[in-house]
């Protein structure tokens, strides 16, 4: 006989264990888009304890819709090895341009990331940062519906040696530092220029404040660099770069 209360208990107890197990992390990633998930995958493969916090119900960021709802994405030659790493199928459109199914990209990266040992917490929004001794040392979290409805509910905190802002165009995590005068400015992304946008996304992936990295479009927003549209190689390479640098700093 199926008992409703047993179903409830199974969900509550297993989620409770997951949350408790991820209150102290090597790396907390904010945003489960392409750069955030790729960073998490390589971090976990390298031995780091990592979790992703995504404010939306679904993960994947801007992958799903491809370009203008045509659910295909393009990846350039430099990032093709990451498609191979994730066993994502693709076809060559022209030399150096590879086309993949957006749904396969989103679901495969998510699945492989979770199977690498990453816990993804969806419907949890980061509303602030923990900053101690001039270093980011954790995130302040609350349920997305609580923040959406404006209810006065105090948050909880997660401790992390490093935090990655993978929130995309708004660089929402870095904004908390800007608001407190801990970084000088966030100019926002520039106009569309795919070639420069892709190159600079990787170049701008860095530690912008002790303990805080930026990846993907958040990296370009911090630097005022161009957007690039539905080409995702830069996102993937950005996530991998951040993971490699953090693993080195963690001595893993």
Swiss-Prot record:
Disulfide bonds: none annotated. Its cofactor is Fe(2+). Its EC number is 2.4.2.59. Keywords: Iron, Metal-binding, NAD, Thiamine biosynthesis, Transferase. Fe cation binds at residues 154, 169. SUPFAM superfamilies: FAD/NAD(P)-binding domain (SSF51905). Pathway: Cofactor biosynthesis; thiamine diphosphate biosynthesis. NAD(+) binds at residues 35, 54-55, 62, 126, 152-154, 217. Gene3D superfamilies: FAD/NAD(P)-binding domain. One of its GO terms (biological process) is thiamine biosynthetic process. Involved in the biosynthesis of the thiazole moiety of thiamine. Catalyzes the conversion of NAD and glycine to adenosine diphosphate 5-(2-hydroxyethyl)-4-methylthiazole-2-carboxylate (ADT), an adenylated thiazole intermediate, using free sulfide as a source of sulfur. Belongs to the THI4 family. This is Thiamine thiazole synthase.
């Amino acid at each position: 006989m199926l008992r409703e209360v047993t179903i409830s208990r199974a969900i509550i107890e297993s989620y409770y264990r997951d949350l408790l197990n991820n209150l102290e992390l090597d790396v907390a990633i904010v945003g489960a888009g392409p750069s955030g998930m790729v960073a998490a995958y390589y971090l976990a493969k390298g031995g780091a304890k990592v979790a992703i916090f995504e404010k939306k119900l679904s993960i994947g960021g801007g992958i799903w819709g491809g370009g203008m709802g045509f659910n295909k994405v393009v990846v350039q030659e430099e990032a093709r090895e990451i498609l191979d790493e994730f066993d994502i199928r693709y076809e060559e459109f022209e030399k150096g341009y590879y086309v993949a199914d957006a749904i396969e990209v989103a679901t495969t990266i998510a699945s492989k990331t979770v199977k690498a040992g990453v816990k993804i917490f969806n419907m949890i929004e980061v509303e602030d940062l923990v900053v101690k001794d001039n270093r980011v040392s954790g995130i302040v979290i609350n349920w997305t519906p609580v923040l959406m409805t404006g209810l006065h509910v105090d948050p909880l905190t997660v401790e992390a040696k490093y935090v990655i802002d993978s929130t995309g165009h708004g660089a929402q995590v870095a904004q908390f530092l800007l608001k407190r005068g801990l970084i000088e400015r966030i100019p926002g992304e520039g106009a569309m220029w795919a070639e420069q946008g892709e190159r600079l996304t990787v170049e701008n992936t860095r530690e912008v404040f002790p303990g805080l990295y930026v990846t993907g479009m958040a990296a370009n927003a911090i630097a005022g660099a161009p957007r690039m549209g539905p080409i995702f190689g830069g996102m993937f390479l950005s996530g991998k770069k951040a993971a490699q640098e953090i693993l080195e700093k963690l001595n893993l």
